[in-house]
Structure formats: C-alpha cells, structure tokens
Amino acid sequence: MIDFSKTITDFRSHVPGIRDWAYFETGSTGLVPDFVYEGVRRYMDDRYYKGGDSLWAYEDETVSTLFMHQRSKEALAEMVHCKPSEIAFGLSSTQLFTLVTEGIDYAEDDNIVTVRKGWIGSRFAWQKREAEGLEIRYVEPEDGRMTAERIAARCDEHTRAVSVNLVESNTGYRLDMDALGRFCAEKNILLYVDGVQALGALEVNVEKWNVDFLVGNDYKWMMNFCGTGYAYMSPKVQKRIRHWGAGWMSDKDRFNTAKDRLDLRADAGRFEIGHQHNDGIYGLGLVAMQNNLLGLSNIESYVCGLADYFCGRVEETEGIRLSYDFPRKNRCQIVVVKLEKSLQVSEKDFEEAKVCAPIGSLDENGEREMRISLHYYNNREDIDRFFAVLKKGV
C-alpha cells in the first residue's frame, strides 16, 4: 500500500514539487513525497468521514495509533543506530532540546561548552540558562570551521556537557563527530547534538559517536509537514532528566483510565506526556523507512556527489565563488556561495526559470550569499538549470 522507491534515481518521481522546479531550499523547508501526502490524507479522510481513531496503513498491515508510534520509532532507531526505546517524539527539535537545558540539574561550578554562532534554537536555550547563572563557554568558529580540537580546548574538569550542531545551518560545515565523540567519552562529558541539518541526508550513528542526546525535526531533510520533533536519549541521559511533567502517555499502561497512581514508563516515551501530532509521527516513520530501504550510506554518497558537482560548476563560472573552503571530511550536502557584485542576476530571474534558490541581502562589499541545499530528489540537471540562470547575468 505504501509505494516506496527502490532506487535513489527513481525517488524523484515520488516528489511532485520537483517535476517543474529545480528546488534548492531543503535546508529551510523540504518537499513532501507522494507516499507521505497520500498516507496522511487517508488518515485525515477517515477521521473526517468516519471519526474515531482510524488506522494507519503500511505495506504489510494496518495498525492503530500507538502501534504506528512504535513502528515509527523502530524506523528512526534503525536510521540513527539506537534502540526504539531510546526515541521520543515532541513538538519540535527545539522543544525537545530543552529536556537537557531545563531538565538536568547542573551544579554551581558546572559549565557547558557550545558554539558561538551555531543555530539559534539550541543557542538561545543555553542563553536562557546562562542568564540564570549557568556558565556557558562559547567556542568561536574560524573561517566557518569548528573543529573537535577547538571545542576540547574550552573544556575542563567542570565541563558537564558539550552542545553542538552536526551540520552548521549557515555554513554547511560538518563536524568531525568521531573525534569529538571520543574526547567526550574519555572525559566523561555528555554530548548533545542538534542533527536537524544532517538527519535524512547523511549517515548518523549515535552509538559509534558516543552521543548522549540527539534531536531532529520533520520538515527539512525528513520531507514532512511542520510540527513534529524527535529525540534520541541515551539511558544515561534518561536517568538524569528531571521529569517536570507527566500525563497519560507517560504511564506504563496508557489506556488504563481506572488507575489511581502514575507508574512512569521505563523508556524515553515517558517524556511524551500527552497525545502527539500523529500525522507527523506517521510521516516521519515513512521517510525513515524509505531512507533505510535506500541506505543512508548510499544517500550520503549521492547528495555529497551532487555537492561536489555543484562546486565544480562554481569553479568554472564567472561571478560566483564558494564562501568557505572546507576539507572534504567537513563538507556535506549544503553549499554556501557568494554572488559577486558584477553578477547581474535576481531572484526574479531564478523564479522565471523555475529555480527555487533564494538570494541573501547585499553585504558591505555589494555581494550576496546563497545557501544551496541538495537532497536526493535533486539531480545534476537541476544544478545545470541553476548555472544557466547565472550565465545570463555574467
């Protein structure tokens, strides 16, 4: 019943939004594949016309809502290399991230090490704690680079946690998680990771990297509608989070309304509290299943190959250059470029060519920046269409 794609090249046919447009804005908001749209619509139609808790369809069976939650957790767990019991759902990646900023009691002499110019969601969450007296140590990037060594240099015996972004949203810099994970494990420092700009496009292995806490969302690389986040929580972190709220979804026996006392679940689901955004959880699970079917190593190789092709076109094109020159191991599916002052091209030119690639404002040098996001529904022809627009402005 779910029409998954068997190959990466065939997947493009499942995304109507890419049929007419060359779409490069997934780093902001991704496109939605047909099997997510149709699956959610089936549920909506059943709720609208029939009422009740309608069933969720899969290739092999239809299941009720709580079983659907479990199947989505199983797919996401396979995608990030953890156990389904270590996955929890929430309103967003940022809301879930506050479980470790607000839910863990840090001692008076503890400090947290994080990135100065990282994504504002987690950075603002730490700044709130900083205003309340917790010491937050910021690591300055150098030419857009944030190495494990620079982060380690800011840590000491009082560092309780390191908080990073796997891929930096504004630069496309990919952190060396092997090195950082080893350091944190050796020093017994908790490792918190925002994986939003990587999950669904790159290989992520929380076990190999010694990650303690990881958050992701639904509407970028996971190709869903907005409103659902998910988190991996290691058993160590689950034990340390102070449970400041509970509800019927937190209980071991979720439909026993005759119970007098709460009996908290032993897994990460105890943090879910109440009814979740079921459409989003279903869609997340479907995309995780699609990713697992294709293989994240194959997906990463494909999207990074597109990025290499894009960078090669940049080198041979006048009026455009790469904003950052990162080592290969730190590159990913996001490429940031500068449009030089001499290049006469506008967003209208891109729109008329049906190329979705927003242009930033003029900087002090009269140049404009563009962030190009390459998903596995993109191909080289999309990239060629982008450069055909630039060629007219030279």
Task: Please name every model-derived segment.
Residues M1-V394:
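Pyridoxal 5′-phosphate
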